Regions:
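Short, Lys/Arg-rich, polar N-terminal cytosolic tail immediately upstream
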Residues: 1-26
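Membrane-interface capping segments at transmembrane-helix boundaries
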Residues: 238-250
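Pore-lining transmembrane helices
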Residues: 20-22, 27-122, 136, 158, ...
C-alpha cells in the first residue's frame, strides 16, 4: 500500500510539473503573438528576396537559424549579390545591429541566472523580443525564466518559418510584395503603445523620440540610430535620480 501511494504521489508530481510547463508555454505564446504576425510576414519578404537573388531555400533556412539578425539579413542579400568582402560585411553588421549592445545590458544579469540557456538568450535577443520581454509581467504561479526562454525561442521559430515559406513560395509564385516590410513598423507601434499605457513614467519614451528626431535631422536615416541610442543612455544615466528607470521585477 505504501509503495502504491508513493508511486501515485510521484505520478501526481510529474503531472503537476507537466501542467506548469504547459502554462509557461501557453502564456509565452500569447505574449509572442504580435511578433509572430510581424516576423512571419517579414521572414517571407526576406525569403522572397533571397530566392530572387538566386539562393535556394536552404540558404534562407540556415541564415535564419544561425544569423537571425532581422534587418541585417535583408542587407546581407545585397552584400552577397554585390560580392562584398568579409571586413565590409562585419562593419555593416556593427553599424546596423550595434544597438543590441544596449539591449543586452538591461538583461545580462537576468540571463546569467538562466544557466545553460544564457548563450541562447543573448543570441536570440532581437529588437522585437527585447520589447516583448520588457513588457511581460509574469504571473506569480509561472516560471519567469521559462517564459522568457519560450518567448525568445518562439520568436526565432517564427522568423525561420517565414523565411522558409518565402523562399519556397518564391520558387513557384510571382507577386508584388511592396509594403510588406511595414508590418515591422506596425508591430513596434503596437508594442510602444502598450508599454506607454503600463509605464509609470513616460520620460524615457519621450526622450527616445526626441533623440531619434534630432539625430535623424542631423545625420539622416542611415546613421542616426547609434548616436540616438548613445544620447538616450547618457541622459538616462545623468537623470536617473530624478527619473528612475523602472526595473524588470524578478519572479
Amino acid at each position: 500500500m505504501r509503495q502504491k501511494n508513493k508511486c501515485r504521489r510521484k505520478m501526481l508530481n510529474k503531472m503537476e510539473v507537466v501542467q506548469k510547463r504547459k502554462r509557461d508555454f501557453v502564456f509565452a505564446f500569447r505574449q509572442s503573438v504580435p511578433v509572430m504576425l510581424g516576423y512571419i510576414f517579414l521572414g517571407i519578404a526576406f525569403g522572397l528576396l533571397l530566392q530572387d537573388a538566386g539562393y535556394s531555400f536552404w540558404w534562407a533556412l540556415l541564415s535564419s537559424v544561425v544569423i537571425y539578425a532581422g534587418s541585417m539579413q535583408f542587407v546581407l542579400v545585397t552584400l552577397l549579390t554585390g560580392g562584398a568582402g568579409l571586413f565590409y560585411t562585419a562593419i555593416m553588421t556593427l553599424f546596423i545591429n550595434g544597438r543590441h549592445i544596449f539591449y543586452g545590458l538591461s538583461f545580462v544579469e537576468k540571463f546569467k541566472k538562466m544557466g545553460k540557456l544564457y548563450p541562447y538568450m543573448i543570441f536570440s535577443l532581437t529588437d522585437e523580443t527585447y520589447s516583448v520581454l520588457c513588457g511581460t509581467r509574469t504571473p506569480e504561479d509561472l516560471h519567469e525564466d521559462k517564459v522568457f526562454f519560450w518567448i525568445s525561442f518562439l520568436d526565432h521559430c517564427y522568423w525561420i518559418l517565414g523565411s522558409v515559406i518565402g523562399a519556397v513560395a518564391g520558387s513557384y509564385i510571382t507577386f508584388d510584395s511592396t509594403g510588406i516590410d511595414f508590418s515591422m513598423t506596425a508591430l513596434f507601434i503596437v508594442i510602444v503603445v502598450e508599454q506607454w499605457q503600463n509605464a509609470k513614467s513616460h520620460f524615457p519614451a519621450i526622450l527616445g523620440a526626441g533623440c531619434g528626431i534630432v539625430w535623424l535631422l542631423i545625420l539622416g536615416p542611415d546613421r542616426f540610430l547609434l548616436p540616438a541610442l548613445c544620447s538616450c543612455v547618457v541622459v538616462l544615466l545623468v537623470t536617473r535620480r530624478r527619473y528612475p528607470i523602472e526595473a524588470q521585477e524578478g519572479r
